[in-house]
């Protein structure tokens, strides 16, 4: 591949990219994308399921699953899905066209015993369906990371959420360094990383540049970089946050693509706020994966039929290439 891989991006360089005229930024990002992916433009479809919902000990300001908040989710009893039910949903997602199945647990850290045994069984079952398997479940130990790798887990998700500078405005129950340590444990076990962030939480463009600098400074780069727009949920501290601008999400996708040429840049939460045209701009900017299905953990997502229409309008195809790799 001819795309230049760097891990030494200066903050000023990244800010300058974010400030480029949009047409110039899109041109640059598309060049990088095509250089890094000469075989053609394919969009990976990923499905996301909340296995354990609610009751999380963390206080992430954006999250309706936190026990510290008063959302509709926290008002309900905690829900834990069983292995058979999860695998049935994975099978349905595969049959609908998804290539990757992501499973989420609202935990501060992975819990040993029966819950972890069930997680391992789910991972094995998803892999047997021929899908990539991704887990997001908070912090984990070296041993847990190794056992997940042995079960066949493709990728571990642990987002940084925002910049180091803005982080203490969003969460107080886990440090930024703990997030980085979790990523390193997953990497040391041979797992690929899924790690990105969220815009629209009161951060500045400089904060967005700083988040991207941290992500691009990871060596190797995360194989998967989800770019989320805040979904402001009633009952969370960010419920009244001013809505983010769709073109700001396009800019984040484009700069993520430029900084991390070979990563899958995943268009993630908040996509319902985007018109079909804005989503096509995100694809042009370098997004090559979308979350596919009617929900993302506890928030809604565009309908499958709408996404099929999106891909058709953009003239791009979904692809099974890269299974077990990203």
UniProtKB/Swiss-Prot annotation:
NCBIfam families in the record: bioB
UniProt binding sites for [4Fe-4S] cluster: 56, 60, 63
EC number(s) on file: 2.8.1.6
Family label: Belongs to the radical SAM superfamily. Biotin synthase family.
Record bears the keyword Glycoprotein: no
Domain Radical SAM core: 41-271
Name assigned to this protein: Biotin synthase
